[in-house]
Amino acid sequence: MPHNQQIKKTVVVFSGGQDSTTCLIQALTQYDQVYCITFDYGQRHRAEICIARRLTITLGAYDHQIIDTSALNVLAASSLTRENIIVPLAEKNHMNSSLSTFVPGRNIVFLTLAAIYAYQVKAEVIITGVCETDFSGYPDCREKFIQALNKAVNLGMAYNIHFISPLMWLNKAETWALADYYQKLDLVCNETLTCYNGIQGKGCGFCTSCSLRARGLETYKQQPKLTMSSLKAKTGLP
């Protein structure tokens, strides 16, 4: 790299799940230094923290911070933070399921802390794997929320940070195609943790998260060329 060329840096909000791992894989091809930030909020599927740590090493992130946000567990009752609240089955209505698994304020906290981290390391981009195409039950996964918080953070910190959500308008099949585009399909399939019940890889097979993941993979395997073509049309990938 020429001496006078600016180093491109980004912070990836990283859980070790399918979506954030796919975002990390892509970011590593686009930035010189990729910083990851993971949050420990007492989630019942907290095995994801160990998986996130391992994946950042395997994939080659520049740095990885694990931040204690246990206040979320105290304040936000959810089936993801309370053992006495049952994780709903995928057969239930998706919108009703989202009410149980929604952790109020989670992405507000995560993205704000990621912005502070970005400020410290002088990164101007934050990447988050939120998506509202397949499952729009969470209000803090909507594009208009991401844009609004981005504006508020920039005003509050007097620092120009750009929140990017590369998966926002991709369906799950296209997200699998993106992992395959970077030749990491097997890694994402076997080494990530998306399951609400904390089971790596294919997961429990019963929760909404596992169902969406499995259906997306099945669709991609049935129509790989069509799905890859759709991905490229949406993203501009060559």
From Swiss-Prot:
Zn(2+) binds at residues 195, 204, 207, 210. It comes from the Bacteria. GO terms for molecular function: ATP binding; ligase activity, forming carbon-nitrogen bonds; zinc ion binding. ATP binds at residues 14-24. Disulfide bonds: none annotated. Its cofactor is Zn(2+). One of its GO terms (biological process) is queuosine biosynthetic process. It catalyses: 7-carboxy-7-deazaguanine + NH4(+) + ATP = 7-cyano-7-deazaguanine + ADP + phosphate + H2O + H(+). Pathway: Purine metabolism; 7-cyano-7-deazaguanine biosynthesis. Pfam families: QueC. Binds 1 zinc ion per subunit. Gene3D superfamilies: HUPs. The keyword ATP-binding applies. Its EC number is 6.3.4.20. Keywords: ATP-binding, Ligase, Metal-binding, Nucleotide-binding, Queuosine biosynthesis, Zinc. InterPro entries: QueC, Rossmann-like_a/b/a_fold. Belongs to the QueC family. Catalyzes the ATP-dependent conversion of 7-carboxy-7-deazaguanine (CDG) to 7-cyano-7-deazaguanine (preQ(0)). PANTHER family: 7-CYANO-7-DEAZAGUANINE SYNTHASE. This is 7-cyano-7-deazaguanine synthase. It comes from Baumannia cicadellinicola subsp. Homalodisca coagulata. The gene is queC.
